[in-house]
Amino acid sequence: MLMVVSPAKSLDFESPLPSGLPATRPPMLDESARLADILRQMAPQDIAGLMQVSDKIAALNVARFAEWHADYSAPQARQAVFAFNGDVYEGLDAASMDRAGLDWLQPRLNILSGLYGLLRPLDLMLPYRLEMGTRLANPRGKDLYAFWGERITTELNARLQQDGSQVLVNLASDEYFRSVKPAQLAATVWTPVFRDSKAGGPYKIVSFWAKRARGLMVRWMAEQRIESPDDLRAFDVEGYRFNPAASNGTTLVFLRDH
């Protein structure tokens, strides 16, 4: 059973890493290099408009892409699950996981990425910013969905075959999961949904909490060695509970009261 999650805009290339941490190379670096070549030719103001960011952030990313190269190693790169630092990754908290948990996640967790396509937890990455929804014109079309085409789905199918699995747990955002083509995926997609209620109000998807909950579920799956989607219903971390009435088929709804 495989999982997909989104990356994060926030990065951490400063915190100490666990000692003896292994590192692997992303499988689609040739594709990443093609994107970096396109971005390297863009002026700071063009990057700012494309990514809808400030001049300061645009300048930072111009410098990043100017220095980006496919032949990189650990001194300048960092394992993906430790490099991303958003809400999902705070919930996952890889830094406090034991080596056995990381080893379990390595062939199962897939981080969708605008630049790298797919990253495993211990794949080395350089700092970057390139959201999947970016309308970056390229030889294959008008945006990154056109650029990646079926490539991400093909790679996921290869990993599903290697894992001997026919289940993909979707813990990614809609923006990122659009890069996967479910009709061509050799798996059934299961989608956990997290809703919170404050002071007895209606249950709603609250972005911060939902993202954190996705990371919590990834960590819980690693700790419990979850291999069946049916077992996902037992997830009960930080007050979430499975709600059968709100769920439907392969959409599993978890509710929490505040």
Swiss-Prot record:
Pfam families: H2O2_YaaD. It comes from the Bacteria. InterPro entries: YaaA (IPR005583). GO terms for biological process: response to hydroperoxide. One of its GO terms (cellular component) is cytosol. This is UPF0246 protein LHK_02295. Belongs to the UPF0246 family.
